[in-house]
Design a protein with these regions (language model features):
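Flexible, glycine-rich beta-alpha linker
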Residues: 1-7, 16
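Residue-level signal for the nucleotide or nucleotide-sugar donor/cofactor binding architecture
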Residues: 3, 26-32, 63, 134-138
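A conserved catalytic-core signature of glycosyltransferases
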Residues: 7, 24, 110
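Short, hinge-like loop/turn segments at secondary-structure boundaries
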Residues: 7-11, 99-102
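A conserved pocket-lining segment of Rossmann-fold NAD(P)-dependent short-chain dehydrogenase/reductase
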Residues: 10-29, 33, 37-41, 45, ...
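Active-site loop of classical SDR/Rossmann-like NAD(P)-dependent oxidoreductases
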Residues: 65, 92, 106-125
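Residue-level preference for well-ordered alpha-helical positions
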Residues: 73, 128-130
């Protein structure tokens, strides 16, 4: 289970979800869909050899931070208050986290850079060929199953 996403689910439980700036977008993929793609690539041939694919859930233009936060809220049966934090705010929080938790800080300046990168969406034309693979698990369903797993295993 992705413990980075877990924090988003945990905060959503309290009705509040701070996220990076509005302009960021990202592509997502369910691990089972990714595993199916890796298995489909095993019998290497000219069609797939020496190629770089960028798989995702098939959502054109990816997910905004706000859309992802609201979808996690729906998976949790909540409607969280989504707060966009600026890069400068996230950097201040990261420095404070470092002062308090030292080397165990969860939010680091490196992570802030990663989180605030504006475009983590797959490159147009880089998805795997439809004849080879296509995603089967919608992100909304995957997030709902993840929320249930967290509940069933007493993480939430």
């Amino acid at each position: 289970r992705d413990t980075e996403f877990f924090e988003m689910f945990r905060l959503t439980r309290w009705g509040l979800l701070p996220v990076p700036p509005r302009e960021g977008r990202s592509s997502l993929i369910h691990v089972d869909d990714l595993a199916r793609l890796l298995l489909a690539l095993l019998p290497a041939n000219e069609e797939v050899s020496h190629r770089v694919y960028e798989p995702d859930d098939g959502r054109k233009h990816g997910w905004s931070h706000y859309e992802l936060a609201r979808t996690i809220g729906l998976a949790m049966g909540r409607r969280p208050w989504v707060i966009h934090l600026s890069r400068a705010s996230l950097e201040r929080i990261a420095r404070a986290d470092r002062l308090v938790r030292k080397h165990k800080a969860k939010l680091t300046l490196d992570r802030v850079g990663y989180m605030t990168h504006p475009d983590w969406v797959v490159t147009h034309g880089s998805r795997p060929p439809a004849g080879l693979w296509r995603p089967l698990i919608p992100t909304r369903e995957g997030l709902k199953a993840t929320a249930q797993w967290y509940r069933d295993n007493n993480w939430l």
